[in-house]
Amino acid sequence: MAKRDYYEVLGVARGASADEIKKAYRAKAKQLHPDRNKDCKVSEAAFKEVNEAYECLKDDQKKAAYDRFGHAAFENGGGGFGRGNGHGDFGSAFADVFEDLFGDMMGRRAGGGGRSRASRGQDLRYNLRVSLEEAYNGAQKTINVPGSVACAACNGTGAEGAVEPATCPTCSGMGKVRATQGFFTVERTCPTCSGHGQIVKNPCQECRGAGRVQKERTLSVNIPAGVETGTRIRLAGEGDAGMRGGPAGDLYIFIEVREHPIFMRDGRMLACQVPVSMTTAALGGEIEVPTIDGGRSRVKVPPGTQSGKQLRLRGKGMPPLRHGPGLNGEAGDMLIELAVETPVNLTARQKELLREFEAINADNNPQTQGFFQKIKGFWDEMKG
């Protein structure tokens, strides 16, 4: 069976550079590696063919001989090309594949001269903590966001000077190449331009051809009234800069509202616990309570108030988030839970008055009387 052209095997043009040949080989070897295609004889044969082609084309002397004489240059001992078991330098080949596999994950290929067509930047996330007062009133916050910005040296093109990106010679600008494996023809991403269809032959030295550089930016963010923990604010175009002039991603700000020393929040509802004196609880009266807007409101305490009683202030809770469909409406309420305070550090006279009060207080503690009646009934049943 006639051997296939080595350039065809690797999917590169005859005028391909050493870097282009190496990139094409890595992509092919990664795709056809035996670890990825176990028990597949077609892939195994194709993998050997790729290694054989690369062993020839990566060597300048062997490549020159092949370009002149084709496969005949290495027949009958010509040229001294030893194929061995068909794998060539397998250790080197595997190292190239390993580097390619994990190099992509670690971002070590960002400085290469291959990719060039514009692509959108990544979206970014920023967690922002605000106070409850800021969530109530709304606020303007200044934040520092690390990320990438368009390279000033090349205006985001990735090319040095006025050099324009060139059409990829491997895929002719299509971004895809076709490879034949046995009876199958497979279309895959072009290994030279990584699917972008263009290459930068003279990459910018500042950004190494990426069209963007790392830089921390200072942004002003408008926090609308009514936000709560989990609220997401989108700043369009404030994410990472795009590759080589592509559009920037978006910045998503996730709000976290800090706990408040006085108020507890549940949606639009606010709640707080307010102490009330024993006499005010017994006789009734008025007390002042703080509100989230920084003011104070007077509320009436009914006579005979017990600890845990709740009073409601209409419209004194959190405002609605005034952004988005279905989010408008009225402000929430504020619940006030009263805690009757037992007096401490009593004087002798105060103690005497309380004892006198207790002596004539038999019919004024219905809950206490009811409780002990239940206890008495319980013990009577046990004895019976």
UniProtKB/Swiss-Prot annotation:
Q: How is the cofactor bound?
A: Binds 2 Zn(2+) ions per monomer.
What Pfam families does this protein's entry cite? DnaJ, DnaJ_C, DnaJ_CXXCXGXG
**UniProt KW keywords:** Chaperone, Cytoplasm, DNA replication, Metal-binding, Repeat, Stress response, Zinc, Zinc-finger
Zn finger (CR-type) location: 138-216
| Region of interest called Disordered, as start-end residue ranges on this chain | 300-322
Q: Tell me where it resides.
A: Cytoplasm
Q: Which CDD domains match?
A: DnaJ (cd06257), DnaJ_C (cd10747), DnaJ_zf (cd10719)
Which cofactors does it use? Zn(2+)
At the top level, the lineage of the source is Bacteria
Which InterPro entries did the record assign? Answer: DnaJ (IPR012724), DnaJ_C (IPR002939), DnaJ_domain (IPR001623), DnaJ_domain_CS (IPR018253), HSP40/DnaJ_pept-bd (IPR008971), HSP_DnaJ_Cys-rich_dom (IPR001305), HSP_DnaJ_Cys-rich_dom_sf (IPR036410), J_dom_sf (IPR036869)
Domain (J) ranges: 5-70
Q: Where does Zn(2+) 1 bind?
A: 151, 154, 204, 207
Q: Where does Zn(2+) 2 bind?
A: 168, 171, 190, 193
List the GO terms this entry assigns under cellular component, sorted alphabetically.
cytoplasm
Q: Which molecular function terms from Gene Ontology are attached?
A: ATP binding; heat shock protein binding; unfolded protein binding; zinc ion binding
CXXCXGXG motif repeat feature ranges: 151-158, 168-175, 190-197, 204-211
Return the PROSITE patterns for the record. Answer: DNAJ_1, DNAJ_2, ZF_CR
A single BP term in Gene Ontology: response to heat
Asked if the Swiss-Prot or TrEMBL record annotates the protein with the keyword Repeat, the reply is yes
In the record, the note on similarity to other proteins reads:
Belongs to the DnaJ family.
What binding partners and quaternary form does the record give?
A: Homodimer.
User: What job does the chain carry out?
Assistant: Participates actively in the response to hyperosmotic and heat shock by preventing the aggregation of stress-denatured proteins and by disaggregating proteins, also in an autonomous, DnaK-independent fashion. Unfolded proteins bind initially to DnaJ; upon interaction with the DnaJ-bound protein, DnaK hydrolyzes its bound ATP, resulting in the formation of a stable complex. GrpE releases ADP from DnaK; ATP binding to DnaK triggers the release of the substrate protein, thus completing the reaction cycle.
Task: Report the domain remarks.
Answer: The J domain is necessary and sufficient to stimulate DnaK ATPase activity. Zinc center 1 plays an important role in the autonomous, DnaK-independent chaperone activity of DnaJ. Zinc center 2 is essential for interaction with DnaK and for DnaJ activity.
Q: Which HAMAP family match?
A: DnaJ
Q: What PANTHER family does its record include?
A: CHAPERONE PROTEIN DNAJ, DNAJ HOMOLOG 1, MITOCHONDRIAL-RELATED
Tell me the protein's name: Chaperone protein DnaJ
Source organism per UniProt: Paracoccus denitrificans (strain Pd 1222)
